[in-house]
Amino acid sequence: MSNILVKTARAMAMAALISVSVLAPGSAQAQPSGIKRTDLQRHDLSVPGREAVQVRVDLEPGVAFGNHTHPGEEIIYVLEGTFEYQIEGKPPVTLKAGDVLFIPAGTVHAAKNVGSVTASELATYIVEKGKPLLTLVK
């Protein structure tokens, strides 16, 4: 196999592993019940070692996604429903459709759907390339 094909195969395998870690944090088997993460796009940036990742996140009513961090900044745009975000060291913030939130790199945070319908957000991450997009925090 040519060197280019080997590199391409390795890159594709790494992308698949990263996708699994994003889709099922803490488990390579399935997404947590009531949570759906859909990878939309991933692109290298002009800043070496950084990439932009966009993910749609859907939480069923009453479902929470526990404390976690990201290896870069997260910008949230709420598409529908109502989220409550708990960001370490700050009071909870409630977000509805059209609201935005910025979360600094490495900041521990959690989200919960506090509404009666599925809550959906567009999450844009500016992160260190090659690191897991999400790390659970106990």
What are these regions (language model features)?
Residues R50-A52, G62-Y77:
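A short beta-loop-beta micro-motif enriched in histidine and acidic residues
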Residues T38-R42, K96, V108-H109:
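Short structured motifs
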Residues R42, V47, P61, E84, ...:
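Extracytoplasmic low-complexity repetitive segments enriched in small/polar residues
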Residues P71-G89, D99:
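Glycine- and acidic-residue-biased ligand/ion/polar-headgroup-sensing regions
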Residues S2-R56, F102, P132-K138:
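A short, N-terminal "cap"/entry segment at the start of jelly-roll beta-barrel domains
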Residues A64-G66, E84, L101, A105-K112:
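Histidine-centered metal-chelating micro-motifs
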Residues L59, G89-G106:
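Short acidic-glycine-tyrosine-enriched beta hairpin
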Residues P92, T107-G130:
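Ligand-binding loop in jelly-roll beta-barrel domains
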